[in-house]
Amino acid sequence: MFLCVRILKRKYHELSSFQKLLIFTITIFLLWVLGVVDKFRETSFGDFSWPLETRNLQLRSKFTKYPQCKFSGNGQKIIIIIIKSSAKNGPMRESVRKTWGVFRMIDGVEVMPIFIVGRVENMEIMRRIDVESEKYKDILAISDIDSYRNNTLKLFGAIDYAANPNQCSSPDFTFLVDDDYLVHIPNLVKFAKTKQKEELVYEGFVFDTSPFRLKIHKHSISLNEYPFSRYPPYVSAGAVFLTSETIARFRNSIRKLKMFPFDDVFTGILAKTVNVAATHNENFIFWCRRVSQKEWDDGVIAVHGYARKDLEYEYSQLNGFE
């Protein structure tokens, strides 16, 4: 090993000044791309604080479509399920509607699934959304462009609607979920019945991670956007259970805080700001994998990663949904 180092040193000294400068420049560039430079410049999470941002955020004026209220008023408790869906994912929404999205009342609890979508430039897709909304009356549409980094704007819309549904009773609980999840509604209801709407509940699959500084990573974030060494604990945005008290706290603060492009991390920031703890629940399964019948029977609530056909097949195989 020592001999190898000596040989490398000798070789390096034999290089021209230009070659040495080139190696130095490439090394610094690679360290920058890999995010190593940013890692050394991060602020300790112990000094975390999130800035306020003055803006006139009138969320309700950004809604372009509202779902029809389908609560009968006869339930002991109410759960609104707001399903995040890309505007182009019409077939997936159809699969949800005919599988776990069919439930309206179970064990005295009313359930109302709706879909929140953004806007796309493709007018044919927007026309289909119009038809779908007219047919099912379960679309909550916002005027912002439907994109990954605009998911925080969908979060704003979902929280605003859940806090004050249009011409509808306010729910006791809100379940935010992506359209590629399989949700076991009886287990969700059973879980909800252990909670009170006055509790502060922000629950799901919790992550406690550091920011990605690798420049080419999908979740890369700059120091200007987020200077701290860690994120606050946050629930994966794919499946989040909230009480009405938590929704109220979130809504009161969400308009005042500086935006962040990743909705799950932003919710963690929001929760930390208003002193709501993120609670980990193993029955919200984030990693894509096969779930056994025993796991469903034992209380699994939501599982991530289903394509349309897989969702329909898995649902048809499950017991306990009837």
Swiss-Prot record:
Q: What class of enzyme is it?
A: transferase
Q: Which domain of life is it from?
A: Eukaryota
Residues bearing glycans? 150
Gene Ontology annotations for the cellular component aspect, listed alphabetically: Golgi membrane
Which Gene Ontology MF annotations are present? acetylglucosaminyltransferase activity; UDP-glycosyltransferase activity
Pathway this chain belongs to: Protein modification; protein glycosylation
Protein's UniProt keywords contain Hydrolase = no
**Which cell locations does it reside in?**
Golgi apparatus membrane
**What Enzyme Commission number does this protein have?**
2.4.1.-
Query: What topology does it adopt in the membrane?
Result: Single-pass type II membrane protein
What is the recorded function of this protein according to its Swiss-Prot or TrEMBL entry? Transfers N-acetylgalactosamine onto mannose groups of carbohydrate substrates. Required for susceptibility to pore-forming crystal toxins in conjunction with bre-1, bre-2, bre-3, and bre-4. Involved in resistance to the nematotoxic C.cinerea galectin Cgl2.
Q: Which family does it belong to?
A: Belongs to the glycosyltransferase 31 family.
Protein's name according to its UniProt entry: Beta-1,3-galactosyltransferase bre-5
Species of the source? Caenorhabditis elegans
Taxonomic classification: Eukaryota, Metazoa, Ecdysozoa, Nematoda, Chromadorea
Its gene is: bre-5
